[in-house]
Amino acid sequence: MLARRLIPCLDVRDGRVVKGVRFRDHEDVGDIVDLARRYAREGADELVFYDIAASARGRTVEPEWVSAVARELDIPFCVAGGIRSVDDARARLFAGADKISVNTPALEDPTIIDRLAAEFGSQCVVLGVDSRMIEGAWRVHQYTGDPDKSFAGHRRTLDWIGEGVDRGAGEVVLNCMDQDGVRDGYDIAQLEAARAMCSTPLIASGGAGRKEHFKSVFELAKVDGALAASVFHKGVIEIGQLKSWLDGEGIRVRP
């Protein structure tokens, strides 16, 4: 396996970075470009930006702030939010994004994955999966950026990951909703199950609270990267220090 990636996640709403707990009660944490610049300086391997309200509001992530971020960064970044067509994706890639992530739009029309992969290559296409245990099974949720519209669909999480990869997704980000923002560790069981059947790079999301949580998810779930938000936003963990610690623990990370 290649060196593991550490990826700050920036949830965007109304032009600002916000953070909630279990996808609820979001608070403002800062300016998009300022935080992007800070994380690049601290040693982040890449960044992920989710416009969390875009799908629920029937719009698409704004290319203006994508361009503003691109002008400041020399590391890769991925954007998501209401991307429903090849033209939507092309505009965001031309604005400077390196990858496009699809979540709710892909659940509504799975062929968007095929079309994006055919047009831009699988390396540009990320499948975002928001998952929670419902009646003994992990199920995919839609419109998770809006509490009034969010719901669990009929798809089981592992089945959907398999379908997304078969359709051409080159990477999967598994957002474990019950772990989101609570800082008590990643959902190792769910991530292990996903790892067992996912042949593409798998990124863990939801639950980081201590540096030991990163070590555990890399060692036990064998994920390729770990997404985190609140611990980075609030300075609980500094990325450069985390990399040094992980390296000392035998986890291969990027310089």
From Swiss-Prot:
It is an enzyme of class 4 (lyase). Transmembrane segments: none annotated. Pathway: Amino-acid biosynthesis; L-histidine biosynthesis; L-histidine from 5-phospho-alpha-D-ribose 1-diphosphate: step 5/9. Its EC number is 4.3.2.10. Keywords: Amino-acid biosynthesis, Cytoplasm, Histidine biosynthesis, Lyase. Disulfide bonds: none annotated. GO terms for biological process: L-histidine biosynthetic process. One of its GO terms (cellular component) is cytoplasm. SUPFAM superfamilies: Ribulose-phoshate binding barrel. It holds the Pfam family His_biosynth. IGPS catalyzes the conversion of PRFAR and glutamine to IGP, AICAR and glutamate. The HisF subunit catalyzes the cyclization activity that produces IGP and AICAR from PRFAR using the ammonia provided by the HisH subunit. Heterodimer of HisH and HisF. This is Imidazole glycerol phosphate synthase subunit HisF. It comes from Maricaulis maris (strain MCS10).
